[in-house]
Every structure is written in C-alpha cells, then in structure tokens.
Amino acid sequence: MHIDFHDETNSVSEDYIDLIQRLLDFAAQKEGVTSEAELSVNFVDNKEIQVLNRNYRQKDTPTDVISFAMQESNEDEMEIIGADGPLVLGDIVISVDKAKEQSIEYDHSLERELGFLAVHGFLHLLGYDHMKEEDEKKMFSRQEEILGEFGVER
C-alpha cells in the first residue's frame, strides 16, 4: 500500500513513520485491502486539527484523529465510470499534541498512541464507525486485534 506521510509539526521521527507504515500495511492485509491502495497520513498540531474539527464536524475543540474517506458516496454524487486509477482510500489527520497528551493520560508509549490513532483512522476509511454501541464494540475490538497481532501493546 502506498502511504504519503506529511509531518507539518516536524516532530515525528522516521522510526515512528516506519512503524506506522508497517502497521497500516499489516492492517490493510488483515482487512483484505489491495496492495495498490493509497492513502495519506498527516501529522498536525492541536491548532490545525481544531480548525478541521470545527469546519468538518462542527466541534470547536482539538481532537486526536480525523479521517476523510474518499470511497464514501452519497446520493447526490455521480459515479465515475471507467475510473482506472488506484484505489485512493483517503486521508488520516493525527494531532501529535493530542497523541502526546493521551500517551501520558493512558500511561503508554507515544509509539502505541500513534499506532492506535493510525489504525483507528484507517478503519474509519474502510467504513468502520462508532456512532452506535454495537458498531463501537466491533470497531474497537478490531483495533485491539490488529494492534495486538502486530505487537503494539499497551
């Protein structure tokens, strides 16, 4: 899977980026996603993610991760017939500030928190959600299963 990484904070080490690349490749394999798929992972600060959260979710507060799925379609969109390009899943935006805060709050490593947020965002791109309790159980169980099998433990 091709992943474009953009670190707007200039604070995410190559080791973390490599880990997230391998983790998302593993998650894609577990979910049956083609190796030709593409997505982007963007690392931002709390200020930037708050703007996105306000503009797209009407919540004027920083959040830890936001996903923008490209494969979602609604009734008003016209289907593109014959689009031969790669499967573009969408964008994952992670607040490095929130990841650091939450790694302290939950008493685990920043590596674990960034991995958790990346997988969480990735599953959203695939259509998982947690708006209903049943869906939340399914999504969170899948997250923990992927992280555990990959070896990113609490």
Swiss-Prot record:
HAMAP family membership: Endoribonucl_YbeY (MF_00009)
Protein name: Endoribonuclease YbeY
Nuclease listed as a keyword: yes
Name of the gene this protein is made from: ybeY
The family this protein is said to belong to: Belongs to the endoribonuclease YbeY family.
Matching NCBIfam families: rRNA maturation RNase YbeY
Provenance organism: Oceanobacillus iheyensis (strain DSM 14371 / CIP 107618 / JCM 11309 / KCTC 3954 / HTE831)
One GO BP annotation of this record: rRNA processing
Alphabetized PANTHER family for the sequence: ENDORIBONUCLEASE YBEY, CHLOROPLASTIC (PTHR46986:SF1)
A GO term, aspect molecular function: RNA endonuclease activity
Needed co-factor(s): Zn(2+)
Binding-site residues, Zn(2+): 120, 124, 130
Free-text function comment from the UniProt entry: Single strand-specific metallo-endoribonuclease involved in late-stage 70S ribosome quality control and in maturation of the 3' terminus of the 16S rRNA.
Location in or out of the cell: Cytoplasm
Stored Gene3D superfamilies: Metalloproteases ('zincins'), catalytic domain
Lineage top rank: taxon: Bacteria
Alphabetic keyword roster: Cytoplasm, Endonuclease, Hydrolase, Metal-binding, Nuclease, Ribosome biogenesis, rRNA processing, Zinc
Segment forming the signal sequence: none
GO cellular component: cytoplasm
Nuclease found in the keyword field: yes
EC code(s) of this entry: 3.1.-.-
Organismal lineage: Bacteria, Bacillati, Bacillota, Bacilli, Bacillales
Cofactor annotation remark: Binds 1 zinc ion.
Group of enzyme by EC: hydrolase
